[in-house]
Amino acid sequence: VTLQRLGPSDAAVLETFVVPRYLTLFGETLLDMFLSSGAADVVHIGCRTGYPDELIADRLTSGSIVGLDPSSPAIELARTKGALIPSISTDYDVFTNFPTALHTASFTHGICLHPSNALEDRHALLAEMARLIMPQGQVLLSLPMRGSFQEIIDLLREYALKFDANNIGKATETASVARPTVEGLTQELESAGFGQVDIDLKPVSLAFRSGRDLMEDPIMRLLVLPDIWATLAIEDVEAPMHYVEEAINRYWSEETFELTVNVGCVSGRRID
């Protein structure tokens, strides 16, 4: 499972700073599309520290939430938070591979926030969701769509042209089209066995005071940059990312640098 491994301090930073400033963008969109009649059994794959499970529980009169994540410190935080949810049962466990140990067709809902951008990872995630969700159950994925973080990709392309770094130039071309489109993501869900596919798309922006502010921000350090690096698939990112930092300082010296995030949430119903 290609997710950033979180140490104890990183898990705490994610919960304190990344969830309220960034993951809520995806969680709120997901909650808007969450269908429930009051009772639900939810599996949350890549649950990190357990957001937005408490908000889902607030909508339910009975049921359960099972969360899975590859990072033990994140799971410990999720368990602590889950123990404070009175209305439904919660269970959080560490996992590393698909398929998980959970039983087939055991859940009414399957959710994931900010999954890996790698296509093979998303296909594996959707296949596991299709296995776990019962017929007519709902899957919800909320993720950055095509066009997200394009400002960084453009600056990396500028670096490649300036320093004749052909490998990075090719990587940026791949990265610029790596994130899913509405049409592409719809097809992915349908191929995995889901129907009634609907996608909500909300463009937003993240503001940074400088290149250093961007590079040191927990949102970038823990979620966005590792995802970009994995998409680029280049070994040495230090020099090009230093160029990005300096370019932001130079081009946006008198104004705020805004990074585009196209927040998308896709919903589908498991076909019988």
Mark where each language-model region is.
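Class I SAM-dependent methyltransferase SAM/SAH-binding core
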Residues: 41-100, 124
